[in-house]
Regions:
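Binuclear metal-dependent hydrolase catalytic cores
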Residues: 1-166, 232-248
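Active-site flanking residues adjacent to catalytic metal/cofactor-binding acidic residues
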Residues: 37, 63, 169, 189, ...
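Short beta->alpha connector loops
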Residues: 41-42, 146-149, 171-174, 225-227
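Cap/insert and terminal regions of metallo-dependent hydrolase folds
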Residues: 172-248
């Protein structure tokens, strides 16, 4: 029997494709909705390697406007135009500036197509923090995370079909993540570095040293950079893999 919620890791890598991994993208499926969390440049490869029709996506949630997290949206648009022939609406949720950034990128990559109206309705919804909304039975809550000062950057908490998922987005460590992930079913946490300590990303020692304080039912490290991949034999926490499917 199918689990109430399935999460497919479409991309578990960082901006540099470390280890040959794809950019950040996660698909959440339930009986009521199918949605994507982040949409990196390699999203179509991730979807098609997992034999997932891009047209199944009801809405997209973007954590912040770095290319490895939103750069795949124009490629989705192109797939919907020429491959899956989408006709139903698509909604994209994201921080302030999402519509302008997405459409500017679409224009830069596919000049002619960006000038014509898309044959399916696309709407952009800017979410604030704290921002809480319900979409197709999914409760979406955005919260601010400390990543880069020039952008509004979010983590997300989702309540879907009786399950709870927290996604850190890109962030430096903050103890707010301990409270945000209390008793959730799945916490997908970025882990970009190992020996390098940064204010804008989490290192493996930082998360490993706090793992005992986390009460989430499952912790999964993602957005993996070259350092944690090179030192994988020293890592005891679960690592995401491209194509991994998690049943909740």
């Amino acid at each position: 029997m199918r689990s109430p919620v399935q999460v497919t890791i479409l991309g578990s890598g960082d901006a540099f494709g470390s280890g040959g991994r794809l950019n950040s993208a996660y698909l959440v499926e339930s009986a009521g909705a199918t949605f994507m969390v982040d949409c990196g440049m390699t999203v179509l490869q991730g979807l098609k390697r997992s034999a997932i029709d891009p047209e199944r996506i009801d809405f997209v949630c973007l954590s912040h406007l770095h290319g490895d997290h939103f750069g795949g949206i124009p490629f989705l648009f192109m797939d919907y135009l020429y491959e899956s022939r989408r006709t139903r609406p698509l909604t994209i949720y994201g921080p302030p500036g999402t519509e302008q950034s997405v459409m500017a990128l679409f224009s830069a990559l596919y000049q002619r197509q960006s000038l014509d109206p898309l044959p399916y309705p696309v709407s952009f919804v800017e979410i604030g923090h704290p921002g809480r909304t319900v979409v197709q039975g999914v409760t979406l809550e955005a919260f601010a995370v400390p990543h880069v000062s020039e952008l509004v950057c979010y983590g997300f908490r989702f309540e879907v079909a009786g399950r709870t998922i927290v996604y850190s987005g890109d962030t430096g460590w903050t103890d707010d993540l301990i409270a945000r992930t209390r008793d959730v079913d799945l916490f997908i946490c970025e882990c970009s570095t190992f020996e390098t300590q940064l204010d804008i990303h989490i290192s493996y020692p930082e998360i490993a040293g706090r793992a005992a304080r986390l009460t989430c039912r499952r912790l999964l490290l993602s957005h993996l950079g070259s350092e944690p991949l090179r030192r994988r034999s020293e890592i005891t926490l679960d690592l995401a893999e491209d194509g991994m499917v998690i049943s909740l």
